Amino acid sequence: MASSASLQRFLPPYPHAAASRCRPPGVRARPVQSSTVSAPSSSTPAADEAVSAERLEPRVEQREGRYWVLKEKYRTGLNPQEKVKLGKEPMSLFMEGGIKELAKMPMEEIEADKLSKEDIDVRLKWLGLFHRRKHQYGRFMMRLKLPNGVTTSEQTRYLASVIEAYGKEGCADVTTRQNWQIRGVTLPDVPAILDGLNAVGLTSLQSGMDNVRNPVGNPLAGIDPDEIVDTRSYTNLLSSYITSNFQGNPTITNLPRKWNVCVIGSHDLYEHPHINDLAYMPAVKGGKFGFNLLVGGFISPKRWEEALPLDAWVPGDDIIPVCKAVLEAYRDLGTRGNRQKTRMMWLIDELGMEAFRSEVEKRMPNGVLERAAPEDLIDKKWQRRDYLGVHPQKQEGMSYVGLHVPVGRVQAADMFELARLADEYGSGELRLTVEQNIVIPNVKNEKVEALLSEPLLQKFSPQPSLLLKGLVACTGNQFCGQAIIETKQRALLVTSQVEKLVSVPRAVRMHWTGCPNSCGQVQVADIGFMGCLTKDSAGKIVEAADIFVGGRVGSDSHLAGAYKKSVPCDELAPIVADILVERFGAVRREREEDEE
């Protein structure tokens, strides 16, 4: 375990770097053929009934001039997480410097005190720190905020230096929200790491528990010849609002549950709007550019729903006021009992969409929320493009190169090399994607061949196999205490086994998640695997997976349905091969050989 005596290695290497926090260029909407907004194929709420004034009374109130807490009369039937929040304000660990004192405490002393034990297991998630009590006791995963998935070589080197210090315990993952998670962190080092993050323009604040997750945007923003709008300015505005410019924003840190937001910038819908609590869909109204809004999309163990139209449009300049209004309506009115029924869609179901919309509208600065534009700018016939490999940018003489990162896992040496490649061949920038891959933008065409010959691209290939290129996997039980099965190595193994059985004519997206929380987003995959346990033919308990089939992304988005339950992992490959033959046009290898 890293010693607190070694804190110096995490201190800011470049004190001036915080000045680089200002974000990329402005918005550019380009005219494209409009298409009508289509509601996702989710069941719509029942017809609105009158909602009582009592039900619309806010359940939280502001205390001490900053923190929002649950009112006394609503404190019955709470879930355990809400009780932890009431026991001590989680944001005080950051906003009042509590983390510095906690970091000095020995683990034995922490364990002996109920509040401090809750601090390391629950409240530190408000600072993006997740104690790996079950699998890496005393070590933490740290999740960052990386709006639009855009990061710099300087930031990447800093993160690499952090995980390098932890040896075999340290590594990093690209997440399904265009983000970094770093592993192996020890508590005594946290204050220095937070300072180091701040110096390079990063934060981990408000990235876990009942907070707004990383704002997602088009990974090709600003370089895509066919983009509708550059999403970077919007996602950076959202991130700045969410964390109040890294200072902490306690008005939205006591939500009933986590909350996801994305801004759509292309016809490809790389951002997966249908599974976000709030999705901004580009649309023009009265000749003015703005966004139609979708709300309520989510994935959870018991239920998954596609986002629904709010029947609302906002000008591009008003993305923050409406985000604030939606969040405050959810914060004020959401229920806090059964944890499986606290996502925002449950509130929409209870109130009805029109009543929910009314609550959002009255929280707008001028009390007005315009009705949706009749058409958005998404081309519903658009074929989703592959960003892996070499592709021309809108900037003449430039290309971007998409690299496949197998199941998103990256080591310190890989990160140092990625930073070097970004500097040597590009503009010092990297883009992370929701499929756990990395894009190097702004590569001069004359440098492309040299980049493709770099040794790292043997590991992070720009041209992976058709089954590997769409492979996504959550952390799994190697590090996550909630995961039922190992996922990352299992995903690679099963894919390798399947590739020996069949040949596919196109990419097939396969997602793995270690438990029903579905961090691996199996419901958006062509074929998904959700971890569980079952008995094999000998009656032995073994790792298994529920299989999902039929998820779609892009202009024809749709969530997958259950196909087969509790299949032992060792028996998955032939079943997956059958699915690929029956539904995806795959050809069995023995047939290929016969034809040759």
From Swiss-Prot:
Q: From the Swiss-Prot or TrEMBL record, what is one GO molecular function term? A: ferredoxin-nitrite reductase activity
What is the enzyme's main class? oxidoreductase
Tell where it localizes: Plastid, Chloroplast
Assigned GO CC terms: chloroplast
BP GO annotations: nitrate assimilation
Q: Which Gene3D superfamilies match?
A: 3.90.480.20, Sulfite Reductase Hemoprotein, domain 1
What does the record's cofactor remark say about binding? Binds 1 siroheme per subunit.
Swiss-Prot/TrEMBL catalytic activity: 6 oxidized [2Fe-2S]-[ferredoxin] + NH4(+) + 2 H2O = nitrite + 6 reduced [2Fe-2S]-[ferredoxin] + 8 H(+)
Q: Pfam families, alphabetically?
A: NIR_SIR, NIR_SIR_ferr
Under InterPro entries, the record lists: NIR_SIR_4Fe-4S, NiRdtase/SiRdtase_haem-b_fer, Nit/Sulf_reduc_fer-like_dom_sf, NO2/SO3_Rdtase_4Fe4S_dom, NO2/SO3_Rdtase_4Fe4S_sf, NO2/SO3_Rdtase_FeS/sirohaem_BS
Q: What is its main location?
A: plastid
What cofactors are annotated for this protein? siroheme; [4Fe-4S] cluster
Keywords carried by this UniProt record: 4Fe-4S, Chloroplast, Electron transport, Heme, Iron, Iron-sulfur, Metal-binding, Nitrate assimilation, Oxidoreductase, Plastid, Repeat, Transit peptide, Transport
Q: Which SUPFAM superfamilies match?
A: Nitrite and sulphite reductase 4Fe-4S domain-like, Nitrite/Sulfite reductase N-terminal domain-like
Q: Where is this region: Disordered?
A: 1-56
In this chain, [4Fe-4S] cluster is annotated as bound at C474, C480, C515, C519
Residue positions annotated to bind siroheme are C519
Superkingdom of origin organism: Eukaryota
Q: Pathway of this protein? A: Nitrogen metabolism; nitrate reduction (assimilation)
NCBIfam families cross-referenced by the UniProt entry? PRK09566.1
Q: Which family does it belong to?
A: Belongs to the nitrite and sulfite reductase 4Fe-4S domain family.
Q: This protein is called what?
A: Ferredoxin--nitrite reductase, chloroplastic
- Source species: Oryza sativa subsp. japonica (Rice)
According to the entry, what is the taxonomic lineage of the organism? Eukaryota, Viridiplantae, Streptophyta, Embryophyta, Tracheophyta
